[in-house]
Amino acid sequence: MKFNFVVGAAVLVLAGSAAAQEGGKTISKTTISLGTATPGGGFPLYGNAFAEVLNEADATILIEPRNTKGSNENIPLLEAGGLDIALVAGEPSYEAFMGIGRSPIRLKILTAMYSSPGMFVVRADSPYKTIRDLVGKPVAFGAKGSGLPILSRYTLDGIGLKQDEDFQSIYLDRAGDGPAMVLDGRAAALWGAGIGWPGFKSVAEGPGGARFIAPTAEEIAKIKAKHSFLKPLTVPAGSYPGQNEAINALGSWSFVLTRENLPDDTAYRLARTLHGVEAALCKKLPQACETTAANTVAAAPNVELIHPGVLKYFREIGVVK
């Protein structure tokens, strides 16, 4: 996979020091650039909450969220040193760590963000009830640089469907453009993932409500057999307006990744601050309730992929031996 990107001077505010006054004392701040994704999606929502809660909790760090094109831009930006930390969806992370279509990355995991069960949303008054009902129809699969189209590609491949041949695939410039396309009929469905995902919420809050389409139990078994890294996940009842029953789906965990050379002490401070305010982050953003030390250890493909500074903190609190 070849990545083309431009790193502008404005992006290159890396983990460096700045000074601030508090109570008459000069406090040295470490500025940390955080790559998110295009406006209107789940990553900017999470990234802004993450930065706000951590900045409030620790006066010595200043996390600055930046909109990017998403996971597929965040990875090369981290590799080039254009970002300190960035949000990356599970499937691009998996491919990059495993060296699928490229050489393996040397980036590290700061934390698991949240699980991302993938599914489609359609208008409640539409005739579509199953994934195969959507074959041949215009479907918005997410923003061009995001991880969502990768998750959908694996999901559909598991049941013998090709994303760009069996559907009229639509790839968005901005994640926030998808819901309007479903509501006005330009798209039959919108693919997305997660609990509290903005796109699903927007369609569900539309005039006629929404219906969600996920793989059937038989389809889930087929997908798991072909792509075992995808895990069974559940969207609890009531996660979206009008969703009265739990939805079983498949997906993976999104991560906050760090550049390879992020200093150990910076990663340690970030981990200590983050996991000290898990409750505050959860209160700020429901999907961030899954951002815990225990989930990070469980979700990491290999514990050695977790940043050494984070591992030091995890050993101190007993989640890693």
Predicted regions and their residues:
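Short, low-complexity disordered leader/linker segments with a strong preference
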Residues: M1-T30
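N-terminal (or domain-start) structured segment
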Residues: Q21-A89
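Bilobed "Venus flytrap"/periplasmic-binding protein-like clamshell domains
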Residues: T31-A57, I61, S116-D184, A279, ...
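Pocket-lining segment of extracytoplasmic ligand-binding domains
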Residues: G90-P92, I100-G101, S126-P127, Q163-L262
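Short beta-strand-centered segments that line the small-molecule binding cleft or hinge
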Residues: I105-Y114
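Short, solvent-exposed loop/turn segments at the edges of secondary structure
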Residues: M113-P117, L250-G251
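Ligand-binding clefts/hinges and TM-proximal coupling segments of bilobed small-molecule sensing domains
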Residues: F141-T155, L230-A299
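An extracytoplasmic/periplasmic, membrane-proximal ligand-sensing/linker region
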Residues: D177, D184, G194-F212, K222-F229, ...
